[in-house]
Amino acid sequence: VKKQEGKTEDYTWLNRFGNMGTFLKNDIKLIRRNKRSRTTVIISALFLLYGLFFFTGSVEMYETPVMWVFAGIFVSGGFLFTFGQYVPSWDSSYYPLMMSQNIQYREYLNSKWYLIVIATIVSTLLSVFYLYFGWHAYLAIVVGAIYNVGVNSYLVLWGGAYIKTPIDLTSNKKAFGDSQAFNVKTLLLTIPKLLLPLLVFWLGNWIWNETAGYLMVALAGVAGFAFREPVFRLIEKIYKKEKYKTLSAYREKAA
């Protein structure tokens, strides 16, 4: 039995993706083996229940289509917000070693992006029970997922370049958030993550109707996906620029 478990742990099926597959294997092992990362995944799963505040009519101020879009962003993006925004801090313990091996930032970032996208899709599928509260509830979640994949997935990786706080994988301390991980740049990136989709929906709803609002938010996500290559080049450039500051911060905290 132990031999079979060890073989399963190898995730050899990811080898077909080259170096990116290696990064994905490392992330999966990190999540499975460490207390902090497992707790983060559990917290991200709890985001699936966040929509109950918005779609059940329990809170009157949330009974508006704009707030439904807000809920959709969070329900589908639990992993994106709890895990994604702390890239590359998850790898802080061996980040200097990785950098000494001259890894390709594109492959590293791609692996994180795919992990976020897969988690977003899984969250969206698991939230299908919201159809019980009406088609508008699940539509808001699907639209939120499209925006998360096409826009927010880039923004969390972008913001991660400015976070210089290492993560202790053996401890659940600050598992619900670390104030040191926020700065002016990361806070500014919060605007397009949370407020821009609400503004886009509001404009579509105001000019035309609710359906147009949902469509415009979804199109914003599709447009972001279409510009994936230039956006990744920009993010890669930022990571390279911040490389030595990040390494210095991790080494300083480890000392």
Placement of each model-derived feature along the sequence:
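Hydrophobic alpha-helical transmembrane segments of membrane proteins
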Residues: 1-91, 105-255
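A glycine- and small/hydrophobic-rich beta-loop-beta segment
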Residues: 95
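Short helix-to-coil transition segments within interhelical loops
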Residues: 99-104
